[in-house]
A protein has these predicted regions:
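Bacterial N-terminal signal peptides that target proteins for export
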Residues: 2-13
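Structural microenvironment flanking redox-active thiols in thiol-disulfide oxidoreductases
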Residues: 63-105
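Short active-site neighborhood of thiol/selenol oxidoreductases, capturing the structured segment around
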Residues: 48-65
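Thiol/disulfide oxidoreductase modules built on the thioredoxin-like
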Residues: 49-50, 117-153
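A short beta-strand-turn-helix
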Residues: 35-52
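A short, polar/charged loop-to-alpha-helix boundary motif
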Residues: 151-163
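N-terminal signal peptide c-region/cleavage motif recognized by signal peptidases
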Residues: 21-23
């Protein structure tokens, strides 16, 4: 092997190692979601399991507001009755704001908010910063995914019977 071929092989190896993590983030139909445990707004633990049929993911406050708007007027337990879990990444929120204002306010919501306080879980799932990622699950595996940037469209999707 020549020096040029050896350098090209090393470069290719490094390139593959750099790009491999990027491709691992894209979820494909049939991928099993790794279980995780986070606390909700009441400091109660929730572990993602095979009972969840829909996972809603918010990467920002704007995305979380979409869900809040979509659920206006819905009864307490609406998401749970649909085996739907909502996880919000709040790592970017200053701790004092989260602790003193945001999380106490979330306790008045009619739905459970699983809080990703350290961005441990949400970054595993692809999606736009300002949209809600919807992962449709069956037995812990992804069967469909879509994003919502409109509260009314999200509300309509949530109102449809789940399969």
């Amino acid at each position: 092997m020549t020096q040029h071929e050896d350098n090209a092989l090393k470069l290719l190896s490094i390139l593959l190692l750099v790009l491999l993590p990027l491709s691992a983030q894209a979820l494909q139909r049939g991928d099993r979601l790794a279980p995780w445990t986070l606390l909700d707004q009441y400091d109660q633990p929730y572990t993602l399991n095979d009972q969840a049929q829909t996972l809603l993911v918010a990467r920002s406050m704007d995305a979380a507001k979409l869900l809040k708007t979509a659920l206006e007027g819905k009864p307490k337990g609406f998401l749970e009755a649909r085996h739907t879990v909502f996880v919000a990444d709040i790592q970017k929120m200053p701790l004092i704001i989260a602790t003193m204002f945001a999380i106490p306010k979330m306790r008045d919501y009619s739905y459970r908010v699983i809080l990703d306080r350290e961005s441990r879980v949400v970054p595993q799932y692809p999606g736009d910063e300002d949209k809600i990622l919807w992962l449709q699950l069956r037995d812990g595996k992804v069967v469909d995914q879509q994003q919502f940037g409109d509260a009314q469209a999200l509300r309509s999707a949530l109102e449809k019977p789940q399969m």
